[in-house]
Amino acid sequence: MTKTTDRRKFLAAATGGSAAIAASSMAAPALAQAAPEVSWRLTASWPKSLDTIFGAVEFMAKRVAELSDNKFKIQVFAAGEIVPGLQALDAVQNGTVECCHTSPFYYYGKNPAFAFGTDIPFGMNARMRNAWMYFGGGLDLMNEFHKEFNVTYLPAGNTNAQMGGWFRKEIKSIEDLKGLKFRIGGLAGTILSKLGVVPQQIAGGDIYTSLERGTIDAAEWVGPYDDEKLGFVKVAKYYYYPGWWEVGPTVGVFVNLEKWASLPPAYKAMLQVAAAEANQWMSAKYDALNPQALKRLIGAGAQLRAFPPDVIESCWKVTHEVLDDVASKNAKFKKIYDNFIAFRNDQYLYTQVADLAMDSYMARLRAQQK
């Protein structure tokens, strides 16, 4: 990696850093005189009610407008206003819209390698993922793969570690998973099905009713702040953790390759900086909102439970069997997978003696002070 390339990646990752701010301020007068007016449409995979996820892409669009002196405008549409949420990538590929804000793992069916744009089960937390994408070669590897789908990808948000879901009954061992009707999809659904779970694909707006009626036994959504809004605590009191299938899930912007190529270099830089700022904005906002939401949920009757050790151990084992099998059959998946796993293992080696040690100590102190 050259010093120039490294600097560009840092500026894109430095979310609102002084260098980016200074550069944009100096460029503004020239842009106002010479820059073309560009109007794009962006379709999101989320409803407006998910105000932190949807709010992040609104924030990104606002920043692009500010940085370009309103010369580059992105109009944001919620899921269903142009296309359904799960068709966002298709709309970008075929040119219906210039870009979308989505979770890449929704498109696992197109090619399993899409999963790396969000996360894989037992993956990396948000900070580790940023390190991998910006400085571990992850983003370059993913965008090399994305070219065949006529898109490029910019990380633009992270929910941080998610919860393990709401359950109508307690999970005491791996045996309790057998026959469990669990609203969960994608790669995690495939893994859990091998342990006897019956995965269910249900839209977010239908989860509450399905739990209430007993159509499903459990459901995962996001985390305390978003889960509280949907009222799950009223119909399923056991709230499990951790959400091992989404340790640090990134959401991001797919841009049509032809549209990306047509952007002036300054506009590309603005979009990269705005997306990186949105990445930090979403993660920080969830960190601010989730603790208080969790307290309220516990006050409303939620029973916090950790998945039993045999459940986690079985999920870990099956996860790597599934991923290794996919890698053996899909060269594009394997190329990213090998890089990802090597980086993940190094990250946890360091975290074990740095963050984890300190976090564990502080958690024990907090418990003692109660």
Question: Language-model features: where?
Answer:
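N-terminal secretory/targeting leader peptides
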Residues: 2-25, 31-129, 137-370
